[in-house]
Amino acid sequence: MAAGYDLAGRVCRELHRAGLSAYVERPGASKQPGVWVEVNGQGEHAGGLYVRWSAPELAEAGMRAVTERQDPAAPEWKRYAEVVLLIQTALIGILRLAGFSVVRAEEVDDVAEGDVYVHADAIGREDS
């Protein structure tokens, strides 16, 4: 796990260099807006990272609109979903430029939609 946290620190540094707020997610730590970097400690991709964008205000507005109006196509929800995809694309580009091996997290974990996955052997490996 120590190697995973080292990798998470390097990812956060690169995101900070690009002007983004980024934090390593740790148990019990409060969630902040920006990019969360979570170390994956299980399964065949153990040691890799999930990189997740957090915009609580935007997410809450989208979820509230869907819940209150019972409308999964609510404009507020669509806006949130589109922002998540735009940020995902930007994060992939930023991290690949820095030399990390990254993919859309859905390619590794089908329930991680909108996240980015950084492979454990991220530095020095060609991207797929």
Question: What is the predicted function of each stretch?
Answer:
Residues 1, 78-82, 109:
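A short, exposed loop/beta-hairpin motif centered on an aromatic-Gly-Thr core
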Residues 1-64:
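N-terminal leader/targeting segments
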Residues 63-66, 117:
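Surface-exposed beta-strand edges and their flanking turn/coil or helix-capping segments
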Residues 89-128:
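Acidic, proline/glycine-rich low-complexity IDRs
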